[in-house]
Amino acid sequence: MSITRIWTAGAVLLLLSACKPDFHVYDLRCEGLVEPLGIDSTTPHFSWKIASEKPMTQYAYEVEVDGNLWRSGRVESTQQVMVPYEGLELASRQQSRWRVRVWNQDDQVSRWSAWQRFGVGIVAPDTLRGSYIGAVPGEGRAPLLGRGFTLKKTPKQALLYVNSLGYHEVSLNGQRVSHAVLTPAVSQLNKRSLIVVYDVTEFLKRGLNQLFIAAGSGWYKPTTFGTTYEGPLVKAELDLDGEPFLVTDASWEGGWSGYADHGTWGPHGFAGEEIHAQMEPQWAPVDVVKVDSVQATMQMCEPCTIQEMLDPVSVTHVSDTSWLVDFGRVVNAQLYLQLPSLPEGHVTPVWFGDNQPDNLDPDICGSDTYISSGVPEGDVFLNRFNHHVFRYVKLDNLTEKPLKIKAYRMRTDFPKRGSFECSDQDLNNIYNLVDWTVENLAFDGYMVDCASIERLGYGGDGNASTMTLQDMADVAPLYLNWLQAWADSQQPDGGLPHTAPNPYKAGGGPYWCSFLVQAAWRSYVSYADKRLLERFYPAMVHWLDYVDTYTVDGLLKRWPDHKYRVWYLGDWAAPKGVDVKDPESIDLVNNCALCQVYLDLEQIALVLEDRVSAVKFRQRYEALAQRIHQVFFHPKTGLYGSGSQLDLVFPLLVGAVPETLMPSVVALLKGRTATLYNGHLATGLVGIPVLTEWATLSQECDWLYGLLKQPGYPGYLYMLEQGGTGVWEEWDGGRSHLHNCYNGIGSWFYQALGGIIPTAPGYRQVRIVPQVPEGLEWVRVTRNTPYGPITVYRNGSSLEVEIPVGVTAEIQGKTFGNGHWNLNYFF
């Protein structure tokens, strides 16, 4: 292996480098967020990345917080991710700023970073002032709540704290104060609501000011979490220069905004919006409502925002009064529509579809109703408190072509920096299909199964896609928010639901419940954020107490249905001919899932220095793995369980197969795949991530590559052959066409073909071992880390690697630091 190091800056004079350090810090984060205005703690953590033109190790750092709150002084440490604040005690509502500089191994120091803002939100025992208010209850109406006030002078700083049960949107003096949509993020609304803080300083003026908050029920409905009031509620507080100035109370007025939501927000019940253009509210005093038992805490993930505005690829006049709009691909979006001048009261029905243009089913993708105002220039309609999954839009009762129509694609506003491309266009197409799907499903602070039919944060779907999404994007804050909903939805006896938030009962099994453990551990591996483990470890252990209740003779058995959870699934959504209802298969899958939980909890306990529990979890894992082999292995056939792909690969992944039997079980897996399944994938939601992880760890890239390349049903290429533009819910194209069932394959592109395997939390240490399927000429992969992007480009037997400062990579037994490395790598 010959090695060449490439430095893009070229040769730099030693004298110049001594005077001007060629490294700097960038991408500063507080609690994983960029300049957050309201974190949920008085002890923040700071992170930064370092760009360097030369080989570098951070030897020391210095952090300042507002100069006098904390001056760390020079701290000799390589730590640059989640560095804890150690200064004077911070207070609720306190706004501060921080900066950092670093030294390298040659004792050169960088320039100070620019000052970065952060704020402590409203944290206990402090509480948000004001009362919950609402207006125009019933019939799904979205109220507009307003209050005028006069200022003699403008403040230096104005912060508006808003806590809504349901969604809200704020405007001040005619301007929206944020680009966020569907605010706040989701939470377990019968236990926790979220506070969002806005800096509204620039929107204020001397004299009369008008503050309006529009609100929509969203998930706050009698049919979901139950409600105190038949409509959304808002509590808000405006602070000027650190002092309370205005709160929501009986002095506010409310009226109907012209928006109404008629859906139940149960399965198939998301409906859409009825929008009356140019509606003038009939102002009346608001209702002041008392809300009990719902904790209000700061939102700790990025908001949901519009990422792009998509134009249609065609607008077709399909009848005298109907238009069919095709956006070319399925998308999770809000619809923007500008209609021509129409008579006042004219009704334009709008239908959405994710697949067939001639079968737009409102039961799946919903429908809107737009009622025109009669203004000569025509009306503009835009979804406000709902959204749709669609490729096709049909407009009825419209003779003229719409003036403008766009899809406002939205998601949680996380950085998305992962990328993949290779010499095989089939693989590129599969990757792009998965990438597009998970990006569209990660919105509002969680990841849903589908955004059209159920819109639930299923744990099974979450487990299936966690590694995929975390390889593709920096979603640490999203997982913090989502895992908080899981902990909040835990029952007093330790039982967990299958979805979180948990508005009503939904189907699944133990693999779904295990999301609390698996997602927390995998997030720690991806982002080195120990808070996740510290915060949710008690809930994980409590869930195991519940599991013990249903453990018989060393094996987990079926537990009962409850009002918050139903079914006891093994795999789900497998191809036709694979019996996921086989009782032995269900028990095998669920006990293998429990093995994964014990392995993860052992590692979590070690990180938290709970060594006694770590030993206990290891012992329980070993006992369960032995029982799985004893009970589910059939010596005569050499099979486990039903002999399905999942029943063979899951025991292999969790180490339940004795080492002496592994070759024969692998041979049976491959042989049965070839003969029984014609070389196709033959598994479902649980099986795809399990098979992917096993193939990655076992370096079975040729075999998995062959499965992916197999045309016809079932498979990803089949979806593409049939015109799919998102991953389907079922292999045959049933139900949703933008779904989270089969996205677990995404991690294979990064960890197998790119060969980027973490060996320390936060990817601080990695092993780079690209796997090379026969016939795949080249691969280029970029995987972002808390330290910066890692890029791997393999072309034939040569390898180029880009490693950020702070990361060390092991490649064929040699250790490499930051820089651009060009290797002749003999596979």
Segment roles from a protein language model:
Residues 23-451, 477-478, 497-501, 531:
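Extracellular/oxidizing-compartment recognition motifs
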Residues 17-18:
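C-terminal motif of bacterial Sec signal peptides marking the signal peptidase cleavage site
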Residues 158-162, 172, 333-352, 460-489, ...:
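Alpha-helical support elements that line or immediately flank enzyme active sites
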Residues 230-237, 251-277, 290, 297-309, ...:
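Non-catalytic C-terminal accessory modules of carbohydrate-active enzymes
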Residues 211, 264-276, 453-454, 472, ...:
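C-terminal capping/lid segments that line or modulate ligand- or cofactor-binding pockets
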Residues 1-8:
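Bacterial N-terminal signal peptides that target proteins for export
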Residues 167, 233, 247-255, 402-433, ...:
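Active-site acid/base region of carbohydrate-active enzymes
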